[in-house]
A protein has these predicted regions:
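A detector of single, family-specific signature residues
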Residues: 1-301
Length: 301
C-alpha cells in the first residue's frame, strides 16, 4: 500500500503517551531528528522532560486525556513558551498500525504536526482551582444530606415518627426534639409545650405521640456520632465558602449581575463561574457551551 505523507502545519511538536508510572515522548519537526524518550512520572523526571522539550524548541505538545494521569503532566509542562494540548482519545483510537507505547507517542506527534488533532478546552489554572473548591463543597453538602436521611432511618427504626408529622427535620423544633431524645431517650409533654411554635401544622399532642418510640443506647450512640459528623462537615463547608468568596472577589461585579437572574443564588453563581468561567470566547457557539456544561444529549455509539 502506498504511503501518503502528511503536510506539516506545525513547526516542531511532541506527542506524549501517558501512563500511571511512565510517559513516552516523541519529538519531531523542522530542524529536528525524530527522537523518542521515556520518563518516569515523578515531578523531577517530568521537569527533565519539560527542559528537553524547551531546549529542542518544541512549540506544541499533544497528549491523550488518559484518566487523571495527564493532569500532573499538563501542570508541569504548562508554560508560555509551549502550547500543551489535551486531545480526545477517540480522535486517534481507531487508527491502525501502532501497537507499542513508542509508536503511540510517534503517531500522536505525526498527527499533531499535520494539524489533524483538535485541542480540548482546558480552563485556566485559577478556574481549575476554583472548580476543585466548589465541587468538593457540593460533595460535602451531599454528604450532610445523606446523613440527614440516615437520622430519619434510625428514628424510624426506633418507631419515632417525627418525619411523618413535621415538614423537615432541619427545623428548630425538630432539632430540639432530636437533641432531647439523644440526651435522655424520651421527651415529656411539658418539654414539647415549651419549644412548640404556632407555625407548626402538627399539634403538641401529635408531636408527643410521634416521639413515643423505644430508643435504645445503640440508637443514641449512632445519632450522637452522626450529628457530630454533620457539625464537623458543616464547619468545613463554611470554611470552603469563605475560600471560594475570597477567590471570586475580583469578579464580584459579575456575580452581582448574575444574581439578578431569577432563581440564581450566590452559591449557584459561584458553581456556574467555576464550571464555565467568565470568558465566553472559549466557546464558539452556545451549543459548545451547553456541551461543555453537560446539559445537552450525548452520542456515544
Amino acid at each position: 500500500m502506498k504511503t501518503v505523507p502528511f503536510e506539516q502545519v506545525i513547526l516542531r511538536g511532541c506527542g506524549i503517551d501517558v501512563h500511571k508510572d511512565m510517559v513516552v515522548a516523541t519529538i519531531s519537526g523542522e530542524g529536528l531528528k525524530t527522537e523518542t524518550r521515556s520518563y518516569k512520572t515523578f515531578s523531577s523526571s517530568l521537569t527533565e522532560l519539560k527542559e528537553w522539550l524547551l531546549s529542542s524548541g518544541i512549540t506544541h505538545v499533544a497528549m491523550e486525556s488518559t484518566g487523571v494521569y495527564w493532569k500532573p503532566v499538563y501542570k508541569i509542562l504548562e508554560c508560555p513558551d509551549m502550547k500543551v494540548w489535551i486531545v480526545n482519545a477517540r480522535h486517534i483510537k481507531y487508527v491502525p498500525g501502532h501497537k507499542t507505547d513508542k509508536k503511540d507517542s510517534a503517531w500522536i506527534c505525526k498527527l499533531l504536526l499535520a494539524g489533524l488533532l483538535k485541542p480540548s478546552y482546558i480552563p485556566e489554572r485559577e478556574q481549575r482551582e476554583l472548580r476543585d473548591l466548589t465541587r468538593y463543597r457540593n460533595k460535602l453538602i451531599q454528604h450532610v444530606s445523606s446523613e440527614k436521611n440516615r437520622i430519619v432511618r434510625i428514628l424510624e427504626d426506633c418507631n419515632i415518627k417525627l418525619s411523618s408529622v413535621v415538614c423537615s427535620l432541619d427545623g428548630v423544633v425538630a432539632n430540639k426534639l432530636i437533641d432531647m431524645l439523644i440526651d435522655k431517650g424520651h421527651v415529656t409533654m411539658d418539654e414539647i409545650t415549651c419549644i412548640y411554635h404556632k407555625k407548626l401544622e402538627a399539634s403538641p399532642e401529635l408531636l408527643y405521640q410521634a416521639c413515643e418510640g423505644f430508643i435504645e443506647p445503640h440508637h443514641i450512640y449512632m445519632l450522637q456520632t452522626i450529628r457530630k459528623d454533620m457539625e464537623q462537615t458543616k464547619a468545613i463547608i463554611a470554611d470552603l465558602a469563605c475560600r471560594i468568596k475570597e477567590v471570586l472577589s475580583p469578579y464580584e461585579n459579575v456575580m452581582e449581575l448574575l444574581q439578578k437572574i431569577p432563581g440564581l443564588s450566590r452559591k449557584t453563581v459561584e458553581d456556574l463561574i467555576a464550571e464555565i468561567g467568565v470568558d465566553m470566547e472559549a466557546f464558539p457557539t452556545e451549543k459548545h457551551l451547553a456541551s461543555w456544561a453537560g446539559v445537552c444529549p450525548g452520542n456515544n455509539e
